[in-house]
Amino acid sequence: NKVTLQTSSGNQIVLENLDDKLIEIDDEILIKKESKKIVFDQKKGIKKLSYNTLTVPYGKRFDVELSDGSIVYLNSGSSLKFPVQFINGMERKVYLDGEAFFNISENNKDIFKVVSNDAITEVYGTQFNVKSYKEDSFSEIILVDGSLGVKGLSDNQEIVSLKPGFRANVNQSNEKIEIFKVNTKIYTSWIDGRVIFRDENIDSMILKLERLYNVIITNDNKKLSDNFFNATIVVEEESIDEVMGYLKEVYNIKYQKFNNKIVIK
């Protein structure tokens, strides 16, 4: 359950074990570790793409600054495969499993693409959130600022444009895209350590709590499936015990806890 970086040569680095400093990895590539973030500098003369994979387990968060200056904030239970160095004149492409917020540096020549489990998001310079876990039935793309296009993975899919303040849902089974107007803060507040639930069903809330706190939650009370929940959690300040205590007090949810397993009665 550690944050790891798998380098292009296959070496695995446990980032949490390292002090904040400059680190040399494959082919004399230097990265800088800054608390819960790593920074890749642009190295000129690179002509061949090679990829690293940053993996963040449940209960953790980590950020990476890519070689073009774009910053990616990775949420719990997520992984990002990205080029060690982007190459001028080539599209900038990364691969996401999980959830991440992207702050993309502007580049009018080299398009930036995020390939997730069932969608491709194309941008030049913008701020947006992508949530695409394998176990989810659809991917969510939320645009905060700028403009972007979304399409399914199939070659014959047309790109759907998204405006700021809107969310695109891409169905994993048929790649159908639906657009909704949303309050983007609800979907991006996790970057600042807050998770906002608004009219959330029990199954969705359980999934998010499992990822945030690295616990296993079983719901034996099927009547709760008809209810919707509201809460705001400050993850680093509130334990899972405090969160469950709140749900018990406000929504009369009864539960038992055994180590990292919670059973809702």
Describe each model-derived feature in a short phrase:
Residues 1-265:
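A residue-level detector for the "anchor" residue at the start of short, highly conserved motifs
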